[in-house]
Amino acid sequence: GQYEPIADLNADEKKEVKKSDLDQIEKYADRIFAAVGIDVEFTRHFLDRVNDARNIKQITPSELTRLFKQSFKKYGKKISKLGDDAQAVINDMKTNINMPFVLNKTKGGELELVAKTVMRKKNFKSSNTKLSFENYSKETE
């Protein structure tokens, strides 16, 4: 006969990302980017777009965590040197996730990385600098 699985291991690929999920991801991103003096913020539009049907396949919390972890490892210092009002796009070539962001200097002089939106799109075009990565190194997990 057919075995019924105890848990749906692909559940998060269909489940929408909740505000509470994004809050946890933001805390994680804040912790790692604090090393280069950057605070991470998500816009309201980011939350709307993370669950958008145009992504074709749902963007998962683990993909967003990977996006921040890998972009920090490859571009953390570079991002911190871009300066106030700089705009760029973080691009994960493995998952085709793109995250346009802007850097703002707060009144306290801290740099804030504001993730404007997020989308899963192959060959994403932007006039801003594209910070791409593909390789996923497991040694820091």
Describe the predicted segments one by one.
Residues G1-E141:
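Ribonuclease/tRNase effector modules and their secretory precursors
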